[in-house]
């Protein structure tokens, strides 16, 4: 049989679609399996090979589950709001809706050409009003529960995109969209109180099957620490500066304080500050720096001492200077820190630069040269002197500050509340109204969805104002509460909004009464297997876990965690070993591979490249190798024989069933394919195989190369689909070779080998072994040992 992929692949894609083979059935009596991949952003560039690898893991598992008798939900959709589409619309004058529709059609065609077994009856699009109605509904539920608030703050702002960015979207001081430098800007921002769920998000990680590095990244991002809040009096005022520290045991070593340049204490006591001009100049410089630049550890220590304000160390009553410095942020902690230069290198460098006292309170090191950051005996600390256990000294200090009324134990999180508004057009409208009498009022639920108006100009204003603010007919409205004149909120939600709950909509995509029917949620949730990239571990995954946990607390969903299992894929690098990029000219178009070698070759190759979670370079020669493998598989059709196959080949088949089955579950796809390649070699060596053996082979290969295997299945006389036939089962006793080669030791040294049957009698094995090494047996044989299936040992004297 020839591997005529251009005919075969179109044929089977149409057959699958016509027969609705991959459509999931709600409430089936079968055991359910919900497989999920991160739905794509449909860019104008179309699909790339990274998409193929990302989707192929759960694709293979989902196909295997169907063959194992599961009711499988394996859906796909499009995360289609976002800046790239809007920027292209601004550039070309084409409406984002038109661009999105074109990109969706292109992506859909590309995905179908690869033969993914998605349930196309459940496709979702986050820009569809029927979808974002429920995004707005969930937002309003959060608003009702006090999880939405508005504040003026220094934010990460991209001057190029003219949009506010969350910390997650501006890592490294660069815009995640256009990679421009981010600046700090004071703006009014809508936040979601994700910090209220920090503990629940941490606890939830104990109940899910995520890779260790995924859990670790989420734990680090949430960043829970235990310590104490301590109040420092400001001399000559009624003010108290509250700080948070994880090392309250070092309070006797505090010799100065640092507050954020934006701290309100400065303006409140400006008349007491002698060097206000220097303070203002430093503030101006800070406004030019990004948050990333301000918080870098390796940089020159800058700051200004506030002349006229002094803090008081609550433990010893000593007056200590207060500085402003750029590395302290109002958005982190309390906007003020205590400094213990003897035991913190940044504080040490700062103290040396500004001539501040350094008092050692933990014995060790040489503080004339550097800070001592290790453990040791407490000194210069009154009631703590002599303590050597850090945990005990912290507990004792917390007890003391509580008794003194100057502090208490506390917990802090590195994660900050989620900046949730964008000053752009192509996003979900925020369903809130600003009323001069009633304040901020929610749009009534029965008026959802609040739809985007049709506009011609998508550019934001130069001051970063949303394009929607220019549309009077949209902005001006009546207050839902009092009926008076009011104005709509003109910012839109970030792209992360729709992806925070999309997996629930797949369950019931056409429901107009709820985001999904509760009985269907109870049947399908949680997601059994979710695959995606490491780049979404600390953004999308944390956001979606937060939204899902909120819905769980409302009683809207049945599980506290949305994803039972998470896996990750590594990058596909260019043939040169570098990350693929258009500028480097090393991008591989997956449809070129489909056109030249077939979808089955592409599917097989991306999983054969190496460890699924690791990065691997593209290799054209290996692509061709996978094509040759599939051609050899097609050739096996002509090798089917009624003559019985050898016992050795039968063992090879049972071994392959066992190995491929376990490898798929462990995402060891490369070794599963290698096993099938080796089995092909065994078949060709034998020169024949039975029809039943060929059927087993193509069932094992089907999840990887479904088009070719369906064609072979049909050629063997079947009129049903291989994709829903029964997954092969192995017999454990048949996974052991009928004969094995074992070593023969004489006086501890291997002198030969003997081929033995797995159940062969001991005496027969020893007799043949002695015959093989007869010339090595000098003297008398004093001991003969046979360890079945392992070794023969003969001792002579």
Question: Which positions does each model-derived feature cover?
Answer:
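Secondary-structure transition/capping motifs at alpha-helix termini
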Residues: 63-71, 91-97, 113-117, 144-150, ...
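NTP-handling and nucleic-acid-processing catalytic cores
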Residues: 3-13, 49, 135-358, 363, ...
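Long, charged, mostly alpha-helical binding arms that flank functional sites
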Residues: 3, 224-229, 363, 371-399, ...
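Long, His/Glu/Asp-enriched segments that create or flank divalent metal/ion-associated functional microenvironments
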Residues: 442-479, 484-488, 494, 743-747
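Conserved oxyanion/phosphate-binding beta-strand-loop segments in alpha/beta enzyme cores
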Residues: 1-36, 66-75, 99-106, 282-323, ...
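N-terminal catalytic cores of NTP/NDP-binding nucleotidyl/phosphoryl-transfer enzymes
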Residues: 25-96, 100, 123-138, 245-246, ...
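Helix-rich, typically C-terminal accessory recognition domains appended to large enzymatic cores
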Residues: 79, 144-160, 250, 409-438, ...
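Residue patterns forming the tRNA-binding/recognition surfaces of aminoacyl-tRNA synthetases
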Residues: 2, 11, 15-19, 91-241, ...
């Amino acid at each position: 049989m020839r591997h005529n992929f251009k005919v075969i692949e179109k044929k089977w894609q149409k057959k699958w679609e016509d027969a609705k083979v991959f459509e999931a059935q709600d409430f089936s009596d079968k055991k359910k399996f919900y497989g999920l991949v991160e739905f794509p952003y449909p860019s104008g560039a179309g699909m790339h090979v990274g998409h193929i690898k990302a989707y192929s893991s759960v694709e293979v598992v989902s196909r295997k589950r169907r063959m194992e008798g599961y009711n499988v939900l394996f859906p796909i959709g499009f995360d289609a709001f976002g800046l790239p589409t809007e920027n292209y619309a601004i550039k070309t004058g084409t409406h984002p809706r038109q661009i999105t529709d074109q990109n969706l059609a292109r992506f859909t065609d590309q995905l179908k050409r690869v033969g993914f077994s998605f349930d196309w009856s459940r496709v979702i699009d986050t820009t569809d009003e029927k979808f974002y109605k429920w995004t707005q509904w969930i937002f309003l539920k959060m608003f009702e529960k006090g999880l939405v608030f508005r504040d003026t703050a220094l934010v990460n702002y991209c001057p190029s995109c003219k949009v506010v960015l969350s910390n997650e979207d501006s890592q490294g001081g660069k815009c995640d969209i256009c990679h421009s430098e981010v600046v700090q800007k004071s703006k009014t921002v809508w936040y979601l109180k994700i910090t209220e769920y920090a503990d629940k998000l941490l606890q939830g990680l104990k109940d899910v099957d995520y890779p260790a590095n995924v859990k670790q990244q989420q734990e680090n991002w949430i960043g829970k620490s235990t310590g104490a809040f301590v109040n420092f009096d400001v001399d000559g005022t009624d003010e108290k500066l509250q700080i948070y520290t994880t090392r309250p045991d070092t309070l006797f070593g505090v010799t100065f304080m640092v507050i954020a340049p934006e701290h309100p204490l400065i303006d409140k006591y400006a008349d007491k500050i002698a060097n206000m001009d220097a303070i203002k100049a430093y503030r101006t410089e800070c406004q030019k720096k990004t948050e990333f630049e301000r918080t870098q550890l390796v940089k020159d220590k800058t700051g200004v001492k506030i002349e006229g304000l002094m803090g008081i160390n609550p433990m010893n009553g000593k007056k200590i200077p207060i500085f402003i410095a750029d590395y302290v942020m109002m958005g982190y902690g309390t906007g003020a820190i205590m400094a213990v230069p003897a035991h913190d290198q940044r504080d040490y460098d700062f103290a040396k630069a500004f001539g501040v006292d350094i008092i050692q309170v933990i014995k060790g090191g040489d503080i004339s040269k550097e800070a001592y950051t290790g453990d040791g005996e407490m000194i210069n600390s009154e009631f703590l002197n002599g303590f050597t256990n850090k945990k005990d000294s912290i507990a004792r200090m917390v007890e003391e500050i509580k008794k003194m009324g100057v502090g208490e134990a506390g917990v802090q999180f590195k994660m900050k509340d989620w900046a949730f508004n964008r000053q752009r057009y192509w996003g979900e409208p925020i369903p809130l109204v600003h009323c001069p009498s009633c304040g901020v009022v929610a749009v009534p639920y029965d008026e959802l969805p609040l739809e985007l108006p049709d506009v011609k100009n998508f550019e934001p204003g130069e001051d970063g104002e949303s394009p929607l603010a220019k549309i009077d007919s949209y902005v001006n409205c009546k207050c839902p509460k009092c009926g008076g004149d009011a104005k709509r909120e003109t910012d839109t939600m970030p792209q992360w909004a729709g992806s925070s709950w999309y997996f629930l909509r797949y369950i019931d995509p056409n429901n107009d009464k709820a985001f999904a029917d509760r009985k269907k949620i109870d049947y399908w949730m949680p997601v059994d297997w979710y695959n995606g990239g490491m780049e979404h571990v600390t953004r999308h995954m944390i956001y979606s876990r937060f939204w899902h946990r909120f819905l769980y607390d409302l009683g809207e969903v049945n599980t506290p965690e949305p994803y039972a299992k998470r896996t990750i894929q590594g990058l596909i690098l260019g043939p040169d070993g570098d990350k693929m990029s258009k500028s480097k000219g090393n991008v591989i178009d997956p449809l070129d591979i489909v056109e030249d070698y077939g979808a089955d070759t592409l599917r097989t190759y991306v999983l054969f490249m190496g460890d699924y979670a690791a990065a691997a370079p593209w290799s054209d020669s290996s692509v061709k190798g996978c094509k040759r493998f599939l051609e050899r598989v097609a050739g096996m059709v002509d090798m089917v024989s009624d003559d019985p196959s050898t016992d050795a080949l039968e063992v090879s088949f049972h071994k392959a069933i066992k190995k491929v089955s376990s490898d798929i579950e462990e995402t060891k796809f490369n070794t599963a394919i290698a096993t099938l390649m080796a089995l092909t070699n065994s078949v060709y060596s034998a020169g024949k195989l039975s029809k039943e053996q060929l059927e087993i082979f193509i069932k094992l290969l089907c999840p990887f190369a479904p088009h070719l295997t369906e064609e072979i299945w049909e050629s063997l006389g079947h009129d049903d689909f291989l994709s829903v036939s029964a997954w092969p089962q192995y017999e454990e006793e048949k996974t052991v070779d009928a004969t094995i080669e074992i070593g023969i030791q004489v006086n501890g040294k291997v002198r030969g080998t003997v081929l033995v049957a797995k159940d062969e009698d001991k005496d027969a094995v020893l007799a043949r072994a002695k015959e093989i090494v007869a010339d090595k047996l000098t003297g008398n044989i004093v001991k003969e040992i046979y360890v079945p299936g392992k070794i023969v040992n003969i001792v002579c004297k």
